[in-house]
Amino acid sequence: MSGRGKGGKGLGKGGAKRHRKVLRD
């Protein structure tokens, strides 16, 4: 899970934005 959030570039814009918000929270 952590790797996916940090690797937003590979996932894309939608995935990266969603993961970033979750990590910050």
Swiss-Prot record:
<keyword id="KW-0544">Nucleosome core</keyword>
<dbReference type="InterPro" id="IPR019809">
    <property type="entry name" value="Histone_H4_CS"/>
</dbReference>
<comment type="subunit">
    <text>The nucleosome is a histone octamer containing two molecules each of H2A, H2B, H3 and H4 assembled in one H3-H4 heterotetramer and two H2A-H2B heterodimers. The octamer wraps approximately 147 bp of DNA.</text>
</comment>
<comment type="similarity">
    <text>Belongs to the histone H4 family.</text>
</comment>
<dbReference type="GO" id="GO:0005634">
    <property type="term" value="C:nucleus"/>
</dbReference>
<dbReference type="GO" id="GO:0000786">
    <property type="term" value="C:nucleosome"/>
</dbReference>
<keyword id="KW-0007">Acetylation</keyword>
<comment type="function">
    <text>Core component of nucleosome. Nucleosomes wrap and compact DNA into chromatin, limiting DNA accessibility to the cellular machineries which require DNA as a template. Histones thereby play a central role in transcription regulation, DNA repair, DNA replication and chromosomal stability. DNA accessibility is regulated via a complex set of post-translational modifications of histones, also called histone code, and nucleosome remodeling.</text>
</comment>
<feature type="region of interest" description="Disordered">
    <location>
        <begin position="1"/>
        <end position="25"/>
    </location>
</feature>
<dbReference type="InterPro" id="IPR001951">
    <property type="entry name" value="Histone_H4"/>
</dbReference>
<feature type="modified residue" description="N6-acetyllysine">
    <location>
        <position position="13"/>
    </location>
</feature>
<keyword id="KW-0238">DNA-binding</keyword>
<feature type="modified residue" description="N6-acetyllysine">
    <location>
        <position position="9"/>
    </location>
</feature>
<keyword id="KW-0539">Nucleus</keyword>
<dbReference type="InterPro" id="IPR009072">
    <property type="entry name" value="Histone-fold"/>
</dbReference>
<feature type="DNA-binding region">
    <location>
        <begin position="17"/>
        <end position="21"/>
    </location>
</feature>
<feature type="modified residue" description="N6-acetyllysine">
    <location>
        <position position="21"/>
    </location>
</feature>
<dbReference type="GO" id="GO:0003677">
    <property type="term" value="F:DNA binding"/>
</dbReference>
<feature type="compositionally biased region" description="Gly residues">
    <location>
        <begin position="1"/>
        <end position="14"/>
    </location>
</feature>
<keyword id="KW-0158">Chromosome</keyword>
<protein>
    <recommendedName>
        <fullName>Histone H4</fullName>
    </recommendedName>
</protein>
<feature type="compositionally biased region" description="Basic residues">
    <location>
        <begin position="15"/>
        <end position="25"/>
    </location>
</feature>
<feature type="modified residue" description="N-acetylserine">
    <location>
        <position position="2"/>
    </location>
</feature>
<feature type="modified residue" description="N6-acetyllysine">
    <location>
        <position position="6"/>
    </location>
</feature>
<dbReference type="GO" id="GO:0046982">
    <property type="term" value="F:protein heterodimerization activity"/>
</dbReference>
<dbReference type="GO" id="GO:0030527">
    <property type="term" value="F:structural constituent of chromatin"/>
</dbReference>
<feature type="modified residue" description="N6-acetyllysine">
    <location>
        <position position="17"/>
    </location>
</feature>
